[in-house]
Amino acid sequence: MRRNAAQWPEKTAFSTLDGRTLGFGTFDRRVNQCNHVMQALGLRPGARVAVLSRNRVEVVQAFGLTKSGLVVVPLNWRIAPAEVVKILRHCAPDALIVDAHGQKLVEPLRGQLPEGLQLLSFDAAQSGWRLLADLMDSAPEDEDPSWQAATQEIACIVYTSGTTGTPKGAALTHDGLLDNARTAAADMLGLDPTDQVMAVMPLFHVGGMWYHLFPCFAAGCSILLLSDFDAGVVLRELQDRRITNVHLVPTMIAALLDHPDAAHADLGAVRMLFYAASSMPPQLLRRAMERFPSCGFAQGYGATETGVLTVLGPEDHRRARDSANESLLASCGRPFSQREMRVVDDEGRPLPIGAVGEIQVRSAGRMRGYWQDAQATDRVLHDGWLRTGDLGRRDDDGYYYIVDRRNDMIVTGGENVYPNEVEAALFADPDVQEASVFGLPDPHWVEKVAAAIVLRPGAACDPQALLQRLRTRLAPYKCPKTIFLTDALPKNPVGKVLRKALRERYEGEPR
């Protein structure tokens, strides 16, 4: 932030659809003011500041609180209010900053929030909330905060639900974030200060942080910040603003290609389209490469806990297209420099090339551990290696392929959904006796959430009515797209439900 403000003070750092622009110099001054406000409220290095908001410039300014050693905790605004409260009570922040949507989300449960929590709003404040902009206007803007960040300390805590649905906060250090930012900017996205980047991924997600925000800071790019994805708007802005670099998930790419404006939109300025969150069906990737003929394509592999790890770059995509070698497109690429990866068996012993096992990683960008959860940390960290829980293999050329997810996680529309969490919500319904949740292939979502349920004796439940009740307990993207009623669930001899058998049974079902 300091370097960009000194080198390009008048250059646009951020712009928005409503015509707002913010230069690097002004942005740095607003960040200073935000830090001074927090210090005046009594926050000191190590204090947590939770942020619950859709994408907007003020969210980026809040990330700048790391400048004074504060720890930023970005929250998913799509989750249910009870889930937000659970995370807030776990990380015990000193301040919560929200937009109007976030305020509406937590207001009904305000009595359950941690005691002493400073309540701040980006928008009009209700009773008990303070408007952050008013506090910032009287704060110093040309002075760096008196407290400074230590590079080895925690900068962010990013929450990811565990397989049991228990929230786990990955503690990411300043050094780790900087390592990921520089690696992504130079080796994955090929950014330079002339790039115009469209940021549409949510900033509470590492996809928005690692593939938009932090790499653009590292390279000095200008960012068009969108609050939501709308295919027509994205096509228009790609064309009119001459966007050069954009990161989308496969579901978004499919929506762009299917939009009526796609056929005549001028997308010639786009030189890099990065996709992640899930693999892309080969037929969809072929369509995208035909529609963006002069654009380089890249995809990466990583996780909240690991940082960015691999890239399948533009040259790999061109080689796969020109040689009709579609199998390469199923790869997540090769590791970056200073990233170590290996495939191991259940005992942690390295496996030979081609063998399938768990992928483990070692890198400067990985998390320090899970916040306030030593047991969960010990389960995934051992001798410097992080156990990803992903099953994969490596080929002779060093390319990695993700084969399956050991924990049965579902990636739908770029969002991670854990079956046990959805099952717990289903089990809470009075009509449900047994339930199992699994992923099924879907042409739009790539993978959709599906559930097979056994009703309680005497229950006559309509699946749509069950879904309506479920939406009061879970975020919409976690709710099953399809519910199958069955008399019994397939189980192994010890009574464990066989999700693989359910996937095989229902794959291709029209319902």
Language-model features: where?
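Conserved structural elements of the adenylate-forming
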Residues: F27-H36, T151, A170-D192, V200, ...
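AMP-binding/adenylate-forming catalytic core of the ANL superfamily
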Residues: I79, L96-V98, V246, S363, ...
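Conserved AMP-binding/adenylate-forming
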Residues: R20, N35-I79, N416
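Conserved pre-ATP/AMP-binding loop-to-beta segment of ANL
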Residues: P9-E10, S127, A139-Y159, T166, ...
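Gly/Ser/Thr-rich phosphate-binding loop
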Residues: I243-L248, H259-S327, E340, P350
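Conserved AMP-binding A3 loop
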Residues: T21-T26, A155-D179
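Conserved AMP-binding/adenylation subdomain of ANL enzymes
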Residues: L178-Q196, V206-N245, H259
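Structural core segment of the AMP-binding/adenylate-forming
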Residues: A40-L41, L70-D134, P457-A459
